[in-house]
């Protein structure tokens, strides 16, 4: 049975992906919480940490938002390498380099228990 991993108050999980969602950078906090080494994450799709409880509609909204060049925020339940899970409040920034290369910068912090409960209730309506 999986268990919830509760982030430390100071934890700040950062990653970068290319336009197709392939991880190009993973912070130490992200690696530690997700249970992967940086080498295991680089080059893999970011949905590697997607938890099956997350409704597809939430990620459709995320992708539609950032592909349009807008910032997305929301609560996400992610899966760890060993099958546990953790909740985050995520902000995903669309990025573009000076060379014109597009990508995304997801930044995540600890979600409070109240925020998590609201997200659970909302996501039940989207299943």
Which stretches of residues belong to each language-model region?
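Sensory/regulatory domains in signal-transduction proteins
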Residues: 3-125
């Amino acid at each position: 049975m999986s268990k919830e991993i509760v982030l430390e108050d100071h934890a700040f999980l950062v990653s970068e992906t290319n336009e197709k969602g392939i991880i190009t950078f993973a912070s130490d906090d992200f690696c530690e919480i997700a249970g992967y080494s940086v080498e295991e994450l680089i080059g893999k799709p970011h949905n590697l940490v997607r938890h099956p409880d997350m409704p597809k509609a939430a990620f459709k909204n995320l992708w539609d938002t950032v592909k349009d060049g807008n910032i997305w925020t929301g609560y996400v339940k992610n899966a760890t390498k060993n099958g546990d899970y953790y909740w985050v409040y995520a902000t995903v920034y669309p990025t573009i380099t000076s060379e014109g290369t597009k990508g995304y910068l997801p930044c995540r912090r600890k979600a409070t228990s109240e925020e998590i409960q609201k997200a659970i209730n909302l996501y039940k309506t989207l299943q």
